[in-house]
Amino acid sequence: MEEFKGYFELDRSRQHDFLYPLLFREYIYALAHDHGLNRSILFKNAGYDKKSSSIVVKRLITRMYQQNPLIFSANDSIQNPFFGHNKNLYSQIISEGFAVIVEIPFSFSLRLVSSLERKEIAKSHNLRSIHSIFPFLEDKFSHLDYVSDVLIPYHIHLEILVQTLRYWVKDASSLHLLRFFLHEYWNSLITPKKHITLFSKGNPRLFLFLYNSHICEYESTFLFLRNQSSHLRSTSSGIFFERIYFYVKIEHFAKVFFDNDFQCILWFFKDPFMHYVRYQGKSILGSKDTPLLMNKWKYYLVTLWQYHFYAWFQPGRIDINQLCKYSLDFLGYRSSVPLNSSVVRSQMLENSFLINNAMKKFETIVPIIPLIGSLSKANFCNTLGHPISKPTRADSSDSDIIDRFLRICRNLSHYHSGSSKKKSLYRVKYILRLSCVKTLARKHKRTVRTFFKRLGSEFLEEFLTEEEVVLSLIFPRTYSTSRRLYRGQIWYLDITSINDLVNYENDWLLDHGNVNYL
């Protein structure tokens, strides 16, 4: 948000009161399109006239208040690339402007809270790694006994979203326009999914922001967990306000909740071993205490959602399981904490006896069946996991085809580097490698055997994963050591988005080269 500092020269006393006029500033939409963030002059960017202008925005807002439908013909979409960019340009433009504007109060409040607390709030890039959540689970959950898998309600009333922003945005005109906009275009902007958290990648940034603010409202009710819990979050959104403002809203929410009937209930939740983790539309509560405490948590969450957020929350959406007998499926991994028995023979004088030690170990494996299902939908194999040739364009070169397969293979290997067992990952690499050969053979109308002879062993070495290459460079003389390290769990802190192949509930979009932003 530091980029906004040079563009918004507003009086600090009026920052919250005059956000509505910013909708008619052209640099707002330049920022929304990622133009000119690092330049002193915004309007010298090539192709900016194809994006947006204040005149277009004024017409859109006027027509929206008049409730006149804005219809573009096919010819307009062809003549103007900007109008053909989205199926619903009307809602897209307004939402992009809103997305930038509603973040302004958050940026100023962040600096204010930092100065009041006299400490620096953690930067968002230190919290963005998805893999950072697994060391936390490995360290904490191996000592817990029970886990509760909570499915966050996705039927959010639009008025609740607007009221959430009232704590930050004091401009009545902006709130009225936002309320009208949400009621008119909610169905056209939200992808119909099972959960509201599963936004498609083409959806506006505004709704990701609204969802994060809604989750912030929900998570700030965990006042009593602030000193006991760790909050390493992973989210598919590029905006990370929910952790930054977790502590800001605690004081306000404490007054609301401790003045009602929940005050007597909170005394039952004194558990120093309670931990909370959220990922996408689900959250996990882990505890070392008895199932009675977990059932009290269940009752508390159901009451919270029904009476505070006015969302119907069925108790069946919260599953309570014994951790040693339950597997958690999230972020492309299947995690469990099984009991591993270790038998030790002890000798004392002439007597010997066996000691059976039960130890808990956090394990993560790659669920091969969903992963093969995603490869099948992407036409890399059939439903049984047999590699097939993938249709390609006639003008695609052999090097482009090989590079694309290598990129997908390395991204998957990089993402699943924390797997305890690599057997499933080896099978995926085999599918991609053979599918690549069959694709090349289909293009040149030759047999697979012929292409294997033509490519030789160098082609197989190209599918060597990045982790193996790095470890072989670190330990060049001890190959067995590097192989042993590779077979272990390796967590990377540069993965900030879920790979589409392992995000089994989303669409299967594979044309992304960098695992950091797929």
UniProtKB/Swiss-Prot annotation:
This is Maturase K. Pfam families: Intron_maturas2, MatK_N. Keywords: Chloroplast, mRNA processing, Plastid, RNA-binding, tRNA processing. It comes from the Eukaryota. GO terms for cellular component: chloroplast. It comes from Syzygium cumini. The keyword Plastid applies. Signal peptide: none annotated. GO terms for molecular function: RNA binding. Disulfide bonds: none annotated. The keyword Chloroplast applies. One of its GO terms (biological process) is RNA splicing. InterPro entries: Domain_X, Maturase_MatK, Maturase_MatK_N.
